[in-house]
């Protein structure tokens, strides 16, 4: 009888120990989860804009989407027209087709490029209505994920030298941050011309 009681007591002790350990582990997990939440930086519009400005800078978006003025070290983005796209109208000079077979041609502001696709002009990315002022976030992400003009399913493809296949690899949060930043920029009123077909550019 004593052995039976001792065995029952041992089983009861083990059961209490298991429950206690389980509760302790659950409490530790809850505390760790709580600490993680406390340590996470909340995503705010201000932090997204800051992140977007950083991404636009390191991705070199100003290289093509900001027209240039001549500085002491050469062309530099015009601070009054940042991200306003191509100024100056479409290409008018005729180009030797043999040259296009070997090179891509750029204007001095690097906002216009000529190649086998014709002439392409850098888009206005500022917050103005002539830029992306009326765009939705979904449009913006769709444009860069699928390479579609204005993010429209039936739109024409984005033309070189826009490196959208590279940008498409960014995370959704990165693209949303870039969009938030662009929407916060100074509006630059500038309607960029549509692409010029190659046949209109080559010398006959």
Spans of model-derived segments:
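Interaction-mediating elements
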Residues: 49, 62, 155, 161-163, ...
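Electrostatic cytochrome c docking/interface patches
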Residues: 33-57, 69-75, 94-95, 134
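Bacterial N-terminal signal peptides that target proteins for export
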Residues: 1-9
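Gly/Gly-Pro-rich "capping" loops immediately C-terminal to redox-active cysteine motifs
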Residues: 70-141, 158-171, 201-204
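C-terminal motif of bacterial Sec signal peptides marking the signal peptidase cleavage site
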Residues: 17-20
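Bacterial signal peptide processing site
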Residues: 22-24
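C-terminal capping alpha-helices of c-type cytochrome domains
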Residues: 134-149, 164-194
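The canonical Cys-X-X-Cys-His
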Residues: 52, 58-68, 140, 178, ...
């Amino acid at each position: 009888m004593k052995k039976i009681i001792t065995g029952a007591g041992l089983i009861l002790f083990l059961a209490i120990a298991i429950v206690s350990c389980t509760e302790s582990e659950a409490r530790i997990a809850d505390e760790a989860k709580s600490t993680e939440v406390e340590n996470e930086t909340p995503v705010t519009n201000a932090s997204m804009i800051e992140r977007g400005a950083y991404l636009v800078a390191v991705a070199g978006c100003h290289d093509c989407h900001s027209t240039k003025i001549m500085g002491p070290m050469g062309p530099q983005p015009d601070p009054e027209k940042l991200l306003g796209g191509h100024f100056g109208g479409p290409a008018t000079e005729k180009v030797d087709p043999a040259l296009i077979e070997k090179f891509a041609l750029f204007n001095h502001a690097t906002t216009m490029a000529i190649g086998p696709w014709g002439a392409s002009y850098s888009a206005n990315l500022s917050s103005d209505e002539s830029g992306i002022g009326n765009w939705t976030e979904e449009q913006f992400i769709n444009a860069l994920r699928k390479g579609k003009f204005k993010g429209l399913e039936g739109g024409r493809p984005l033309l070189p030298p826009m490196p959208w296949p590279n940008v498409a690899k960014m995370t959704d949060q990165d693209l949303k941050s870039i969009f938030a930043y662009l929407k916060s920029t100074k509006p630059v009123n500038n309607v960029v011309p549509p692409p010029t077909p190659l046949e209109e550019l080559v010398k006959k």
